[in-house]
A protein has these predicted regions:
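N-terminal presequence-like segments and the immediate start of the first folded domain
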Residues: 1-77, 81, 85-97, 105-173
Length: 173
């Protein structure tokens, strides 16, 4: 519960993963997470605040680098909500292994690493050296539902027991 106390101190709240997956505004079909041994692989997550998309738009046109940075923090917070759902306790994370960040970028925008620093910085704030992942920051022109940022997180965890993944296709009507 140490990590959750740090989140509280930062004024950050994890959302209800099951509720968010049932909403499935994008109609996407994928699993929330999968494990291989003690490695937890997450599907991409986007910025959510108060149950709604946060800071949507194109970075470098509609959004500033600073707004993109904040969006990346919230996208990582969405990842942490899935980690908590899967593992039951964020303290089970032993190492952030890899973070891949996609930035909905204006033509010619080349500051994706500065935007994705928002996600990396939050990992380090929470986990210290264990929060330093390998990383890629990729610019793209367009993300689902006009999200500004999407991150894909992989972590190494301790202990046994992982909640089965939520599958978005189960909720598509």
């Amino acid at each position: 519960m140490i990590i959750e106390k740090k989140l509280d101190a930062l004024g950050l709240t994890l959302f209800d993963v099951d509720r968010q997956y049932r909403a499935n505004a994008s109609g996407a079909r994928f699993m929330s997470h999968l494990t291989v041994n003690n490695v937890l692989y997450l599907s991409g997550t986007t910025p959510v605040k108060d149950g709604a998309p946060h800071l949507t738009g194109v970075v470098g046109a509609e959004l500033s680098i600073e707004q993109g940075y904040e969006a990346a923090r919230y996208a990582l917070l969405s990842s942490l909500a899935v980690v908590k759902y899967a593992l039951g306790d964020l303290d089970r994370v032993q190492q952030a292994v890899q973070l891949i960040g996609f930035v909905n970028s204006a033509p010619g925008f080349a500051q994706q690493p500065r935007v994705i620093n928002g996600a990396t910085d939050l990992l380090v704030e929470l986990y210290g050296d264990r929060g330093k992942p390998t990383r890629a920051a990729i610019g793209c022109q367009g993300l689902a539902l006009n999200h500004s940022v999407e991150v894909v997180l992989t972590v190494l965890f301790s202990g046994d027991g992982v909640t089965p993944p939520l599958a978005r296709d189960h909720y598509v009507k």
